[in-house]
Swiss-Prot record:
One of its GO terms (molecular function) is double-stranded DNA binding. Keywords: ATP-binding, DNA damage, DNA repair, DNA-binding, Exonuclease, Helicase, Hydrolase, Isomerase, Nuclease, Nucleotide-binding. It comes from Clostridium kluyveri (strain ATCC 8527 / DSM 555 / NBRC 12016 / NCIMB 10680 / K1). Residues 509-808 form the UvrD-like helicase C-terminal domain. It holds the Pfam family PDDEXK_1. The heterodimer acts as both an ATP-dependent DNA helicase and an ATP-dependent, dual-direction single-stranded exonuclease. Recognizes the chi site generating a DNA molecule suitable for the initiation of homologous recombination. The AddA nuclease domain is required for chi fragment generation; this subunit has the helicase and 3' -> 5' nuclease activities. ATP binds at residues 24-31. Its cofactor is Mg(2+). It catalyses: Couples ATP hydrolysis with the unwinding of duplex DNA by translocating in the 3'-5' direction; ATP + H2O = ADP + phosphate + H(+). The gene is addA. This is ATP-dependent helicase/nuclease subunit A.
Length: 1235
């Protein structure tokens, strides 16, 4: 292999006999390294490892397939170089049975090979996510019914306290806690352990608990924030004359806070907070000029005081009641944990009845097979695990940062220990963004912080930091931002020099518009106070649409630059050169696409930008899906008026609003179905009013009612998927939606519903009722499937996708939008919180007194979960930044630009390189992390200028990153993108001194009105000509220098003068060419032979009877008896109807164009050569003409252009010289030499 590996990559590839953690930063080639290590294992003669003796687990099926494919390609290339290698042949043969797979696939393989060890039926099946949800809901409803029947007091108290109005909240808690517990290797044991935390003994001391440790740390961070605010104000007022009397109180406050920060025990900090007091600020008249500083100082001190009092009242003193609170909370938590374990049993039984397992079972059953207990009850590898440990020579774990605890135990059970350590883990903890799937980045961090970088270590760490993806401008920006914001508190890793990416991507130097500074675009959502009174509501855009218009403007600037701008270029590896940017090079990334993507799609479409949003919502709201579901609902139960009316109004029903009114008038007390039935049957049993129902409506009712009855009979005997497709075709609805706007997407949605029904028939639920129930539960549980995907990878559209979906991908241009969107912290406000280490954090509830408030434990968990959520958000931001190859643009909106920039500058007002932890924790969105970092960059001057309060920030001047910061008002985007303005346009016009500059403006108006496009002639150059079109479009002129052309004027003969009797001359010519193409030239010696061949063409349906009659067999005989026909028959190589394409310079056709400007403009010439044959290694070209001609010289002039280009193309096509060029005129049986 010719890859040039870096030294650290070589170490990762060749380091033997150890547990190896490879911390591979974004774009550092981790997959290539992993593949190469696998290769070296199997091609190294000294090791003699077969590829099936290696276990390679990946995160996704796509990653596993790619890995296997890359290994296969590499082995094939090696085999080409050494085709006799038995080992390479063997490894390629073993590749298909290799263990390169997802962790779930491996676990499934273990289960299938060892099902007898856990008493599992070998014929089990895996239920999909939707069937699992349905089964869980059924199990949960049954469980709750049983508990109510038992009148279980603990359950009843639990339902009163946490159930809400209809127990739905308690059901959500049970399901959530069950799912969360599945992330533990032993879920029931974890539930039992967390319950013990609430059963307090008499010697309980909060200061000794795990909760106190977390709370102490959080309080310390908040205290540091308070101290920093006071220090910043003190630094500001120290140099302001007139505020000297504030210095001592502020210094005293800082000392008090410092004292609290340095306390290390809970009891001591509690005592100090109780004694905490604040001296009153001395009052003294000050100069009005310093009043703003005085007010700022007072307000900051009041804010700090309020914060400290809040900590004392809401946290410190709350611990005094913890013992009493826990006495009441413990029985509730006991009932909750027992309820979850009962649910586990019921759900497990339901799966067993159906002989199925779910995805959680796959890992847990595998774990059960691979573990056992020793005599002390400790977990040890089972016999099966030891067999796998012996079998696998090395275990590779890709994307290790996304592993969970269950997977960690599984890998530990089958990996070797001590001197035979064989675990290879590769990943990047900075890209761990799947905590919601129970991923545990702590597993990676534990090894990252404990493994040694020294060679020979049994637990070794190697860092890959050379980025081969992104331009230096992007790498510099990534390092600049994350060195300031990613720390152990927020991000769970201190991003220092060792974690910085190093730019190693190869981008050839280019003088044009490419790459460039990272751009930050901030829009102020605040309405303009001077807004015109007549502004209409349409222009009052919401924040998402405003940002979408900004993005559309930026995309158009890149893809469709104005005349005075150069086109943006991107480097294309396939052509190894720069090319103009295309829409498909641009991806808009969002934290979440729901609500945002539709607005962006609309605005981009309005701007003429093709766009595709990869969303997971909107499917069930599509009109075609709603219509079909309504149809299914009334087939199941026709008495439902809402879906019935929806169907009647749809194209399937075809009823008008007036029709529905007439039907409703029949009887207002009964359903529409009953009304239709009464009309159909002319029922006289009830006093219906049918007089106003005319024959037309009666006929329509009868037709619809008959169809409905037929469908209701058919659905009983047909599988649901077949029935749905039958409906599509019988009603013609599938074709109908295909003709609607967005028809391809709509038909894809219908096919997706059909496929979903196909999957449904394979699950344990059957029938139309259950299918409708299944769909309704999907809708109610927010499991929207998203629109069906209809775009391929190479469609030239801008893509909108979530940051999560972009992980592992790369794109030339990334626009990170929605950077001002608030972080979603709703999960930390639930009534019961869960944490792996800290256990349960419930609300204190008292149903009798109707009170509830968060326990101190819930406050601890809330703070801890907020930190972990923010850490995840920071890693998500890192993933977004590192997707960009050549250009990174960040956009976001803020509520008030001045207040926001002041907040940013205040956060950036610190001496350390890292931004303060408290400001990172209190950030609301991505912009609150990016903004302060950019504010202290030299390029962030606009942030510092707009900030209403002057901060003397310590600028970071030694950094290589380059930024462009743009600030907009919401008013900039009121109308269309082309109408964007930088300031109030009315005021701008009024400020112009028109009287003093009339002549200047007059000249400018004339200049603009008389402007002509410099290259207008190029717009008239055709991209492609056929040779015959060339002959028609241009008139030949003979000059001394060769052939020139001029465009003639043609006047068409009026239609009424044109006759149409039989075949036209053109049609007769086509038929003659067809016969001459297919005729066998070895059988043209007589009339009968040629006639027989023409008849065969009729029989084979090449031509019709009428067309055959237009053929003159005698004309064909004369051709083959002519000089040129005889020469053709003698040739061994005759070619007929040969198509060609040839590029020529546009100036060759358009002589009026300047040569130096249009030399590179090409025109494509295409045509079909009737016949050519070889003669003495040279070519003879023959073109047939069936026209009725008069003057031979006029024919020569008419066709010379065509034959000229035929000859030129033929020489270029074959590389041989064309010796002679002939026209054969069938009308005169004449050969014309045009050589």
């Amino acid at each position: 292999m010719n890859t040039k590996w870096t030294e650290t990559q070589k170490s990762a590839i060749f380091t033997p006999n150890c547990n190896l953690l490879v911390a591979a930063g974004a774009g550092t080639g981790k997959t290539a390294v992993l593949v190469e290590r696998i290769l070296q294992k199997v091609i190294n003669d000294s090791e003699e490892v077969d590829i099936d003796k290696l276990l390679v687990v990946t995160f996704t099926n796509a990653a596993a397939s790619e890995m296997k494919e890359r290994v296969g390609e590499a082995l094939s290339k090696l085999l080409e170089l050494n085709c006799t290698s038995k080992n390479l042949q063997r490894q390629l043969a073993l590749l298909n049975q290799s263990n390169i797979m997802t962790i779930h696939s491996f676990c499934l393989k273990v289960i299938k090979n060892n099902f007898h060890r856990i008493d599992l039926d070998p014929n089990f099946r895996i239920c999909d996510d939707t069937e699992s949800k349905l089964l869980k809901q059924d199990a949960l409803l049954e469980l709750f019914e049983e508990k109510y029947e038992e009148e279980n007091l603990g359950f009843l108290n639990l339902a009163d306290g946490y159930g809400g109005k209809n127990d739905s909240k308690l059901q959500d808690i049970v399901l959530s806690l069950y799912e969360f517990s599945q992330g533990s290797p032993w879920p029931k044991r974890w539930l039992q352990d967390v319950l013990k935390d609430f059963n307090l003994g008499s010697d309980f001391d909060f200061g000794d608990t795990k909760w106190a440790k977390v709370l102490m740390h959080n309080v310390t961070v908040e205290l540091k924030g308070c101290k920093n605010k006071m220090k910043n104000i003190l630094n500001t007022i120290e140099n302001i004359e007139g505020l000297e009397h504030y210095l001592e109180p502020f210094k005293s406050d800082i000392e008090s806070i410092d004292k609290l920060i340095n306390i290390t025990t809970w009891d001591e900090i509690r005592d100090e907070f109780i004694k905490l007091s604040f001296n009153k600020l001395p009052s003294k008249r000050t100069d009005p000029l310093v009043k703003s500083y005085k007010d700022k100082a007072r307000n900051t001190r009041d804010e700090v005081k309020k914060k400290l009092i809040s900590i004392r009242e809401d946290i410190i003193l709350c611990t005094d009641d913890i013992y009493e609170n826990f006495k009441e909370v413990y029985p509730l938590m006991k009932s909750l944990t027992f309820l979850v374990m009962d649910f586990y049993e019921k759900y497990h039984n339901k799966k067993s009845e159906r002989n199925m397992i779910d995805f959680n079972d796959i890992e847990h059953f595998c774990l059960e097979i691979l573990t056992s207990k020793d005599k002390n009850g400790d977990i040890i590898p089972s016999e099966a695990a030891l067999e796998y440990r012996e079998y696998f020579e090395e275990i590779f774990i890709d994307e290790y940062q996304d592993s969970n605890e269950v997977q960690e135990v599984i890998m530990n059970m089958i990996s070797r220990k001590n001197i035979y350590a064989n675990l290879f883990m590769v990943g990047d903890v900075k890209q761990s963004i799947y905590r919601f799937r129970q991923a545990r980045p702590e597993l990676f961090l534990e090894k990252y912080n404990s493994y040694d970088e020294k060679e020979g270590s049994k637990n070794r760490k190697i860092k890959l930091s050379e980025n081969f993806r992104s331009r230096k401008e992007i790498i510099d920006a990534i390092n600049y931002i994350f060195k300031q914001i990613m720390c152990r508190e927020v991000g769970e890793l201190d991003y220092g020099e060792e974690e910085c990416l190093k730019s190693s991507a190869r981008y050839e130097p280019f003088e044009g518009n490419c790459g460039g500074d990272v751009e930050l675009h901030v829009v102020d959502k605040k309405e303009n106070e001077n807004k015109l009174e007549d502004e209409n509501e349409e222009e009052l855009l919401d924040a998402i649409s405003v940002e979408a218009r900004l993005v559309a403007s930026k995309i158009n600037e890149l893809v469709n630059p104005s005349l005075d701008q150069y086109s943006f270029k991107v480097y294309d590896k396939e052509i190894d050169n720069y090319r103009s940017i295309m829409y498909k090079d641009i991806v808009i990334l969002m934290r979440a696409t729901q609500n945002w993507a539709p607005a962006f799609v609309e605005e981009l479409n309005n701007s003429g930008i093709p766009v595709f949003a990869d969303t997971s919502v909107g499917y069930f709201q599509a009109i075609e899906i709603k219509t079909i579901i309504s149809l299914l609902q009334i087939i199941d139960n026709p008495l439902q008026d809402i879906p019935f009316i929806a169907l009647l109004r749809s194209p399937i029903g075809g009823f008008s609003p007036e029709d529905l009114i007439d039907l409703r008038v029949v009887n207002r007390e009964i359903s529409f179905y009953e009304i239709l039935k009464a009309i159909k049957e002319h029922s006289l049993e009830l006093k219906y009013s049918l007089e106003h129902i005319d024959e037309r409506l009666e006929y329509k009712v009868e037709q619809f009612f008959n169809k409905l009855c037929l469908w209701r009979r058919k659905v009983i005997h047909m599988p649901i998927d077949e029935f749905i497709w039958h409906i599509y075709i019988e009603t013609g609805y599938y074709g109908f939606v295909g003709a609607m706007p967005g028809g391809i997407q709509r038909q894809a949605n219908l096919r997706m519903l059909f496929e979903r029904a196909k999957q449904y028939k394979n699950i344990s639920y059957k029938g139309l009722f259950n299918f409708i129930n299944f769909i309704n539960k999907l809708k109610s549980s927010s499991t929207d499937m998203g629109n069906a995907k209809i775009l391929g990878e190479n469609e030239n559209v801008v893509r909108i996708m979530s940051i999560h979906k972009s992980k592992g991908l790369e794109f030339p241009v990334i626009i990170l939008s929605g950077a001002g969107k608030r972080f979603n912290l709703t999960d930390i406000n639930k009534s019961v919180l869960f944490h792996k280490e800290l256990g349960l954090g419930p609300e204190y509830v008292n149903s009798e007194r109707h009170i509830s408030y968060p326990t101190i434990v819930k406050q601890v968990l809330k703070r801890k979960l907020k930190m972990e959520t923010l850490s995840e958000e920071m890693r998500i931001l890192y993933v977004a930044f590192t997707r960009a190859k050549e250009k990174l643009i960040i956009t976001g909106t803020v509520d008030n630009i001045e207040n926001t920039f002041q907040r940013w500058c205040e956060a950036a007002y610190c001496e350390e390189d890292k931004l303060p932890e408290y400001s990172l924790i209190n950030s609301r969105n991505f912009l609150d992390w990016i903004g302060p970092a950019v504010a202290r960059h030299p390029c962030g001057e606009i942030i510092r200028k707009v900030c209403p309060f002057e901060y003397n920030l310590n600028l970071i001047t030694g950094d290589d990153s380059k930024w462009k910061v743009f600030v907009y008002s919401k008013d900039n985007f009121k109308s269309t993108l082309d109408e964007n303005i930088d300031e109030d346009i009315i005021g701008k016009i009024k400020s112009l001194e028109l009287d003093n500059n009339k002549e200047i403006y007059k000249n400018e108006v004339y200049r603009r009105l008389n402007w002509t496009y410099k290259y207008e002639q190029s717009s008239k150059i055709a991209a492609k000509f056929s040779v015959s079109e060339l002959k028609r479009r241009f008139k030949l002129i003979d000059t001394e220098n060769g052939i020139e052309f001029m465009e003639p004027i043609y006047l068409k003969k009026p239609a009424f003068l044109r006759e149409s009797k039989g075949l036209t001359p053109s049609e007769r010519g086509i038929v003659m060419h067809l016969v001459m193409q297919h005729i066998d030239i070895d059988k043209v010696g007589s009339y009968e032979q040629i006639k027989e061949q023409v008849d065969k063409l009729v029989f084979r349906e090449f031509i019709t009877e009428a067309e055959a009659k237009s053929i003159s067999v005698y004309k064909i005989i004369k051709f083959f008896n002519s000089e040129i026909g005889i020469r053709m028959k003698k040739s061994n190589n005759v070619y007929r109807e040969v198509p060609f394409y040839m590029e020529i310079e546009s100036t060759e056709l358009y002589k009026q164009l300047p040569q130096h400007i249009y030399r590179d403009e090409k025109v494509l010439i295409q045509g079909i050569i009737d016949c050519y044959f070889e003669e003495n290694n040279e070519l003879i070209l023959v073109d047939y003409k069936t026209d009725h001609v008069g003057d031979i010289d006029s024919i020569k002039e008419k066709y010379q252009v065509q034959i000229y280009y035929y000859g030129r193309a033929l020489e270029k096509l074959t590389g041989k010289k064309v010796k002679k060029k002939y026209l054969y005129l069938f009308s005169k049986d004449y050969i014309l030499d045009l050589s």
